[in-house]
Amino acid sequence: MATTQTQTAEVDVALIGAGIMSATLGAMLKQLEPTWSQVVFERLDAPAEESSSPWNNAGTGHSALCELNYTPEVAGKVQTAKAIAVNEKFQVARQFLANQLEQGVLSDARDFINQVPHVSFGHGADQVQYLKKRYETLSKHPLFPGMEYTEDPDKFSEFLPLMGTGRDFSEGVAISWTEVGTDINYGALTKQFLAGAVKSGTEIRYGHEVANVKPQGSKWKITTKNVHTGDVSTTVANFVFIGAGGMALPLLQKSGIPEIRGYGGFPVSGEWLRCTNEEVIKQHHAKVYGKASVGAPPMSVPHLDTRVIDGETGLLFGPYAGWTPKFLKHGSWFDLPKSLRPTNVMSMLAVGVQEMGLTKYLVEELLKDQSARMESLREYYPEARDEDWELVTAGQRVQVIKPIVGPRFGSLEFGTALINNTEGTIAGLLGASPGASIAPYAMLEVLERCFGQKMVEWGPRIKEMVPSYGVKLATDPKLFNEVWEYTQKTLKLEK
């Protein structure tokens, strides 16, 4: 079929990727500048089919209530700085979602967020001692109210029957928990955001792959291809945001901005064990996070998770890591080699040598068969039966490799990195965890870095969207309590 070139269109804002990041930024800009035209480009035929899809992530509302990698122990002391920072960012997300419900942009809170207890689990003397220290430290902090702790086997089994039945308690176990954790369906949330965007005039072009992003004066020329017809079209945008998951790196590279020089990406695939037995699923209602093995990367932290997806309760365990050179679940086997540049190849090669813990972990994970996966599950659920669990593939995560700094030939980062040009006309988000949980916080950072000249004008409206904007809730318990009660009620999380 012959391809055709359509006439160039012009738009104020172009969002690449129909996932939670683009959807969140689009909603913010629509509220701040309702007259600005927006277009979303998505390679697939539906929104939220990659990392935002509910079975492609754990759906944890990451607020450091249970995730032990945010509270490392250093010289016998539990460090809380990361936990407080992550919690602060999630409070921003809660406020923004509540505001969007009040504004009618989002339609149904129960469709995308549900209250599920968050639990930290430790077994063996060392882990129990650590967990007790962690509880004693965090429970005193205003951002972690209502946290509880027990080492009692009976209380453990009452709260977590699946994990208690058949367990040998002689080695010692402990859990700390809070009832007010959340499970979030980021796929449903993305779809609600985009449905609201369409109502307010945003154009969404599904089945359109962005082939190139190049500067055109002070603007950006975006070349897209219809994946079904092969037709090529161009769009000129005043501002471009690349929220395309793993493909943000190659698209930023194509843009030619100097800020992306030296950056690379290391793709890691994931798998879950998903429970297929309804009777088993009914016996567990919590997100239970354990401790990563010594030397293992943060992504290896195992967890047994209640999920609420499309009104149905599910149960998963994992993640188990894998490796492919793809940057997206529906990506190409050539994604990684195509991303190599003279400015990043040394950093990417060096990471394999410098990150021996990650290399060892990936090799061990790749060698695991189903019996080995079930053995890992039985550390949490001792009586798990093989026939009750199926293996499903999760989303693709591309970890950030930062440029060479000092003596290190590049460094592997397990967080996110926002890249933008100095003019603030193009930005993209790299990396993975905590990802979707901090989307509103990350998109506010996009606004600050790319629209600095507008922030004074936008300030009052941003404060309406996020009442705590510009304030550290950790130092203002009164405001924290106010926004907590507001979000609990508006998001229908009150019991």
Regions found by a protein language model. Give the residues of each.
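Short beta-strand to alpha-helix junction loop
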Residues: 81-94, 121-129, 176-196, 205-207, ...
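Beta1/beta-strand and adjacent pyrophosphate-binding region of the FAD-binding site
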Residues: 7-21, 39
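Helical element adjacent to the flavin cofactor pocket in flavoenzyme catalytic cores
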Residues: 173-239, 437-450
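Glycine-rich FAD pyrophosphate-binding loop
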Residues: 30-54
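Flavin (primarily FAD) binding-site architecture
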Residues: 242-257
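Helix-loop-beta segment of a Rossmann-like dinucleotide-binding subdomain
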Residues: 108-120, 158-200, 221, 357-361, ...
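Dinucleotide-binding Rossmann-like beta1-alpha1 core, especially the glycine-rich loop
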Residues: 59-158, 313-314, 326, 332-335
